[in-house]
From Swiss-Prot:
This is Photosystem II D2 protein. The D1/D2 heterodimer binds P680, chlorophylls that are the primary electron donor of PSII, and subsequent electron acceptors. It shares a non-heme iron and each subunit binds pheophytin, quinone, additional chlorophylls, carotenoids and lipids. There is also a Cl(-1) ion associated with D1 and D2, which is required for oxygen evolution. The PSII complex binds additional chlorophylls, carotenoids and specific lipids. It holds the Pfam family Photo_RC. 2 of the reaction center chlorophylls (ChlD1 and ChlD2) are entirely coordinated by water. Its main location: plastid. The gene is psbD. The modification N-acetylthreonine is found at residue 2. A plastoquinone binds at residues 215, 262. Chlorophyll a PD2 binds at residue 198. Its EC number is 1.10.3.9.
Amino acid sequence: MTIALGRFTKDENDLFDIMDDWLRRDRFVFVGWSGLLLFPCAYFALGGWFTGTTFVTSWYTHGLASSYLEGCNFLTAAVSTPANSLAHSLLLLWGPEAQGDFTRWCQLGGLWTFVALHGAFGLIGFMLRQFELARSVQLRPYNAIAFSAPIAVFVSVFLIYPLGQSGWFFAPSFGVAAIFRFILFFQGFHNWTLNPFHMMGVAGVLGAALLCAIHGATVENTLFEDGDGANTFRAFNPTQAEETYSMVTANRFWSQIFGVAFSNKRWLHFFMLFVPVTGLWMSALGVVGLALNLRAYDFVSQEIRAAEDPEFETFYTKNILLNEGIRAWMAAQDQPHENLIFPEEVLPRGNAL
């Protein structure tokens, strides 16, 4: 008996094949299957943000002005989180809160959930786009894996943290000054700077910046095919097509500087990938911990001694007092519905912390 092995061919393409051919066609802007998620979500997220920062007030949710229409500028405008009373409602336009009324939906903070959810799926779509293109041109998927780090940070800060708290109210609003206020909130209520996961994140981001600067300078320093452009300094031609720097020379240089150096390009570039991605992932895990109100380092012995001995003080105990001041000021301002009334003697007074 003879068995013929071969690929099964269809006489005519079905709808999937037609869609696949159109979506993945080589064009100026690649669409792909991931584009079905990326482009609509990115469009709605950016459109919602521009709409909110231009027209929508935060008076009903935070008692604040937050739009260009009210006099804010690029640094102070924001799309604000919903009120605390709305808890974790998705705030759908057709939901029980807004009941299809667009103006009421904006007043309630519906644009924030709209931007946050479409933004999250837009970022995921961008990562899938990198997977799809890498597969199409037979590359490894490390670009997509690296991009998972900022996605993890976004999801942990904007979605998981408020899900662990009482509502979307405690997430950051989408604006520059709003993010700064959220950072102060994190410090005052969670002592975030003393959290080991934050420390790993800082080490990852700053370490990556250092590696990037060193790597770029080293490659430029060890070019062995000089450019001859009249408008720039020698040995630098940004349009040079081929790779003409000396890894051996770079290795000798850094071996003399540090005593150690990367021996090959693969290990060097993997390390440049590993440092920032690991740092961002660690900080994302730390924010998940804050969602559950896990504490940072507590040096209680220093606090007790500082309370007993007026002459004993450390930078740690000063920071703890500063955090208490942040909490005392922010809690009453940010949560007026709680009717938090602090007696005058516990409120911070200028520098007398």
